From Swiss-Prot:
GO terms for cellular component: cytoplasm; nucleus. A motif (Nuclear localization signal) lies at residues 66-77. It comes from Periplaneta americana (American cockroach). PANTHER family: PERIOD CIRCADIAN PROTEIN (PTHR11269:SF16). Disulfide bonds: none annotated. Forms a heterodimer with timeless (TIM); the complex then translocates into the nucleus. It holds the Pfam family PAS_11. This is Period circadian protein.
């Protein structure tokens, strides 16, 4: 990022702040010489100090030329940023160097100083146009402390001349005197108690200890080898740079030692200096208040983003440096505070670690900065990329109060550059109408996140990128007003200029018409007004969401209840089994109506449920069992015999005796709950014909024996066997229901047609039925006493001559002979449908018919009630609806 700083164009490119007493920065006044002969460190403004006397005069200077006068005039106008550090350092430069020289093989250096030998060094050409540097690395004894080698009396070799010789002699003499004084002070330190030691030699000890700590601490750590990174150590006392890594030259272009002794904030962009100072002030409070007794780094590591100055040398910009603009590059500064306490300090006491209690304690606090260059994320113009998501947050006033640092490579802005600015200023003016609709949805959703269509967002270089945003918001639950809006962004397309850190071009704003700009201002005000309104609670949407949740819950509960009802039905099964006999199931065709089923595997017709079919079947079987309550055995036998005679004539596909025996046995067994007998009625043993009585009795006895002793063992009944049995029975009962419904309707229509034909034939032949009071009384008597002996025989002549003819004809129509045998000429009809015929023609109450009534309906009733012998047990059965439903059971089984 390049920006113009007009006040820096006159400053030397070395970025050093020139103090008012910087006359010794250039030791040679000759403009022809390229080498620095200064005896003082350029980092500390080059002041020499004489140890023998109290004079602080500078070294002899050459004649001042016109160029030097101009330069000095310019330097006097500039403010000094390190005057305090320079003054404190000048008084200790010689002593520090002398101590270091004596400590590091000082004998050889002293011999050099005494003999006056000049050490030739390979000087380097300075890359500055105003200030020449002591070019070689050998000109500095310790780059970590920023002390020049020239103070020790070692100067680069130059062209012989009287000025150079005088300067060299003065330097060597000063060095020799410094070494002698340091020896004297060291000898006195062994005799003088530690309590009486003055500050005259404590400062050199601190300086030496600081130098050693810096060298040991930062040289032991691996330097930043990552591309675009370098490390800087800044003293927290005066903000002066005391250490840099060699990679600084590759990143910003400055030589390795050019930052030493300079204030770090001078290299920070002017607009970032205030934010940097505030960040350091807030971060340095904790390390100073909670100092580590043993030294070391503090855990508080934080980051700051700012722009650092680039180097303007001859190699990079050529001649005419003052006419070039000062450029800056964006960096991420990872800062750590490090405390270095002198290990040999005699005043260091355990528990007493405050900076005031340690001489020079404040000098031991350093700020370690690792600067990482931030580059643009785009390689070419209009690049389509999938960036990581970054977040911004702005208030209801549209002022940004949080910016994710991840956005810098994509937007080109530093976080503190966007904070406090209106987010509406970054939107494209033509997209503001669409964004107004987006903010309306934000107010309606009441905090629910949603994703909008892409829109354009301005980058630092003036171009626009394409963003896709997922919006959310927070509404104050008490004031019902919007507090802030959060946007999670993702870049879809880069700007036309790939370098987003470049300075914006002013001509880009001219591409948008004035009308669009005016309209955008109006829309911005509307958006601000919209966000300041009270958020309305959308009750309709909430009701819809609530109803949807209720429906989902109801569906879930229904499915859950279906699963729960299955074991509930199974648990009730043992209670129902005690009221029925397994013998009944065997005799009814191995069908057990005792169990209920929870699922009806029906066809598309959706027949009645299995529970309903089972219930109807149980009731029907109860009425068919003809329970004996107050009747005698003889009357029961007569009813069973009459029923057997009817049932045996209409059984198709099976022999009459077998069906009759099965029916009789079933009826007797169904009476067992009423009679209180577990093995059936005792009178049932003598019923039936002689040929089939024995077989029925043997089957009943065998089944009863098996039921009570062998076949039915409750402990052997398992759940798997019960479920399989229930499924089979369910299928069979549903199938019976279908067959009964289909066949029953066909046979009923056939029976009605046959009866209708016989009635028409009777009327055509003029048959007159003779009535008698005895016949009429028989009808009345049959309705009152269903167990009379009149229904014992199927005699067609019992009701009269006319009645007998009709009866025989009807018997032929139904396929039944008068003798009780199956008639071969006509299709057989199950016996239950004979009962069905009686039900259709017999009203549910007693009817007295007059013989002289000539109307066909009366003839129909008279015919039906007089000529067809009615079984005595059928006269009293009113709920005969179940008889018709149960008709196919006798045929299929």
């Amino acid at each position: 990022m390049e920006e113009t700083a007009t006040h820096n164009t006159k400053i030397s490119d070395s970025a050093y702040s020139n103090s008012s007493n910087s006359q010794s920065q250039r030791s040679s006044g000759s403009s022809k010489s390229r080498h620095s002969n200064s005896s003082g460190s350029s980092g500390y403004c080059g002041h020499g100090s004489s140890i023998q006397g109290s004079s602080n005069e500078p070294f002899p200077q050459p004649s001042v030329t016109k160029r030097n006068k101009d330069k000095e005039h310019k330097k006097k106008k500039l403010k000094s940023s390190v005057t305090t550090a320079a003054t404190a350092t000048v008084t200790s430069v010689v002593t520090t160097v002398s101590e270091y020289t004596e400590h590091e093989n000082g004998t050889s250096h002293m011999s050099l100083g005494v003999s006056g030998t000049v050490v030739p060094l390979s000087g380097t050409v300075a890359e500055e146009t105003e200030i020449t540097e002591a070019g070689s690395e050998g000109s500095v004894i310790s780059s970590h402390a920023g002390v020049a080698l020239g103070a020790a009396g070692v100067v680069p070799a130059t062209t012989p001349g009287p000025e150079n010789e005088a300067h060299q002699m003065a330097s060597l003499t000063q060095t020799l005197n410094s070494i002698k004084k340091m020896k004297k002070m060291k000898d006195l330190s062994t005799d003088i108690p530690e309590e009486t030691e003055g500050h005259s030699f404590s400062l050199p000890m601190v300086a030496e200890e600081k130098e050693e700590h810096i060298r040991n601490s930062f040289d032991a750590e691996p330097p930043a080898h990552n591309e675009g990174e370098f490390c800087v150590v800044v003293s927290m006392q005066d903000g002066v740079v005391v250490f840099t890594t060699p990679s600084i030259t590759d990143v910003v272009g400055f030589p390795k030692d050019m930052w030493l002794g300079r204030s770090f904030i001078d290299f920070v962009h002017p607009r970032d200096r205030t934010a940097f100072a505030n960040h350091i002030t807030s971060g340095v409070i904790t390390p100073l208040s909670n100092s580590n007794p043993k030294g070391g780094s503090h855990p508080g590591k934080n980051s700051f983003y700012c722009c650092l100055r680039r180097y303007r040398g001859l190699k990079s910009t050529g001649y005419g440096v003052t006419e070039k603009e000062v450029s800056y590059l964006p960096f991420q500064l990872n800062m750590t505070f490090r405390e270095l306490l002198p290990h040999s300090n005699p005043l260091e006491v355990e528990g007493n670690t405050s900076p005031e209690s340690v001489p020079g304690g404040c000098n031991s606090m350093f700020l370690v900065i690792t600067a990482k260059l931030i580059c643009s994320a785009y390689k070419h113009a209009g690049e389509t990329c999938a960036s990581p998501k970054f977040v911004t947050r702005h208030l209801a006033t549209c002022k940004l109060n949080y910016v994710d640092p991840e956005c810098m490579p994509y937007l080109g802005y530093l976080p503190h550059e966007m904070l406090g600015n209106s987010v509406l200023d970054f939107y494209h003016p033509e997209d503001l109408p669409f964004l107004k609709e987006v903010y309306q949805i934000v107010m309606q959703e009441n905090g629910a996140p949603f994703r909008s269509k892409p829109y354009r967002f301005r980058s630092h270089n003036g171009g626009y990128i394409l963003l896709e945003t997922e919006w959310s918001s927070f509404v104050n639950p008490w004031s019902k007003k919007l507090e802030f809006v959060v946007g999670q962004h993702r870049v879809l397309k880069g700007p036309e200029n790939a370098d987003v850190f470049m300075a914006p071009v002013e001509d880009d704003t001219l591409q948008i018409s004035e009308e669009v700009l005016k309209e955008s201002k109006i829309i911005q005000e509307e958006i601000r007004s919209l966000l300041s309104e009270m958020v309305k609670n959308n009750g309709h949407l909430e009701k819809q969401q609530m109803s949807k949740r209720c429906r989902d819950l109801a569906t879930f509960m229904e499915s859950l209840m279906d699963d729960i009802t299955k074991p509930d039905l199974k648990l009730e099964l043992p209670q129902e089994e005690h009221s029925f006999s397994e013998h009944d199931s065997v005799m009814l065709g191995e069908i057990s109506p005792h169990h209920d089923y929870y699922d009806s595997k029906s066809s598309t017709e959706t027949p009645p449920s299995y529970n309903q079919l089972n219930y109807n079947d149980n009731i029907q079987r109860f009425f068919e069992s003809k329970p004996k309550t107050t009747l005698s055995d003889e009357s029961g036998e007569s009813k069973i015999e009459a029923n057997r005679s009817l049932m045996s004539t209409d059984e198709e596909g099976k022999s009459g005796p077998a069906a009759d025996s099965s029916l009789g046995s079933s009826n007797r067994k169904c009476c067992s709950p009423v009679n209180g007998s577990g093995s059936g009625s005792g009178s049932g043993h003598s019923s039936g014909s002689a040929g089939i009585g024995g077989s029925a009795e043997s089957r009943r006895d065998t089944s009863a024996t098996n039921t009570s002793h062998g076949s039915y063992k409750p402990p052997l009944l398992t759940e798997a066997l019960l479920c399989r049995h229930n499924e089979d029975m369910e299928k069979k009962m549903v199938q019976k229901h279908r067959e009964q419904r289909n066949k029953g309707s066909e046979r009923e229509s056939k029976l009605k047609k046959c009866v209708h034909d016989k009635l028409l034939q009777e009327q055509c032949h003029g048959v007159k039925r003779s009535g008698s009071h005895s016949w009429e009384g028989e009808v009345y008597k049959a309705s009152k006493h269903p167990h009379v002996e009149g229904g014992k025989e199927l005699n067609p002549g019992s009701g009269g001559s006319g009645g007998g003819g009709v009866t025989s004809g009807l018997s032929q129509c139904l396929g039944v002979a008068a003798t009780g045998k199956q008639y071969s000429g006509v299709g057989s009809v199950p016996p239950i449908f004979q009962g069905g015929t009686n039900v259709n023609l017999w009203p549910p109450f007693s009817v007295t018919v007059t013989p002289l009534q000539p109307t066909p309906p009366c003839s129909t009733h008279g015919f039906a009630t007089n000529n067809i012998p009615t079984p005595p047990h059928m006269a009293s059965m009113i709920p005969v609806y179940y008889i018709e439903k149960r008709a196919p059971n006798f045929k299929n089984n």
